[in-house]
């Protein structure tokens, strides 16, 4: 394979990687603009959790936080 083709493949791969990373950051910003809380952030009846995560509260309802779903935890465990 010629060096020009290798350079082109490298550049296309780098652009793809950067675009995927930018898309992740954009989706995080969109969720915060919608007014939802991410994983392990505070939540309430007026501030819901993003991505359908459950809002888990202490026994006296004073410390509510969004928890990751079992699917997310399972996925993270096997991605390591």
From Swiss-Prot:
Its main location: secreted. Expressed by the venom gland. GO terms for molecular function: ion channel inhibitor activity; toxin activity. Keywords: Disulfide bond, Knottin, Secreted, Signal, Toxin. Residues 23-34 form a propeptide. InterPro entries: Spidertoxin. It comes from the Eukaryota. Residues 1-22 form the signal peptide. GO terms for cellular component: extracellular region. It is found in: Secreted. Disulfide bonds join 36-50, 43-55, 49-66, 57-64. The presence of a 'disulfide through disulfide knot' structurally defines this protein as a knottin. Belongs to the neurotoxin 02 (plectoxin) family. 05 (U19-lycotoxin) subfamily. This is U19-lycotoxin-Ls1a. It comes from Lycosa singoriensis (Wolf spider).
């Amino acid at each position: 394979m010629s060096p020009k083709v290798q350079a082109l493949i490298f550049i296309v791969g780098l652009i793809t990687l950067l675009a995927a990373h930018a898309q992740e950051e954009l989706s995080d910003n969109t969720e915060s603009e919608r007014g939802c809380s991410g994983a392990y952030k505070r939540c309430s009846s007026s501030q819901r959790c993003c991505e359908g995560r459950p809002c888990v509260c202490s026994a006296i309802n004073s410390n509510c936080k969004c928890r990751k779903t079992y699917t997310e935890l399972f996925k993270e465990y096997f991605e390591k």
